[in-house]
């Protein structure tokens, strides 16, 4: 007997606009049969929660590819991140390659330089971003995610 169904959001159960009626009915049916329905995503909880509200998720939500797990209320029940010193080493290295990644700290998106990539990603993820010219001045202990988006495939391959 199946006890749990874990689904991603983007390109799996969500088409970028809405959940289909068939999907919602299927989720409700498996719940009635005692199957736990769980979301696992690379998104932040803030972003994921805006999308999954219509599904009335009552189980923990796995975010950042497993780096955080949240209760449906948003409370973090598990978190693992990159320590500050390692994060800063990575970010400084990326700067030497003229790469300015999306930086996630405490469910917020930061960038050191505004780019078209961060604007588009922010719109897609439904999460606002904050420009911080020097992230090392931000008082964080751990960083949740560093996301590199660049059109230069040679840079990406080299990473």
Model-derived features with residue positions:
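Conserved acidic, metal-coordinating active-site core of Asp-based
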Residues: 97-99, 104-159
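Short, basic/glycine-rich phosphate-binding loops at helix/coil junctions
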Residues: 6-7, 68-71, 137-139
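Short, small/polar residue-rich loop motifs at catalytic or cofactor-binding pockets
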Residues: 1-2, 32
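Short amphipathic alpha-helical segments
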Residues: 9, 75, 142-146
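Active-site phosphate-binding/coordination module
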Residues: 21-118
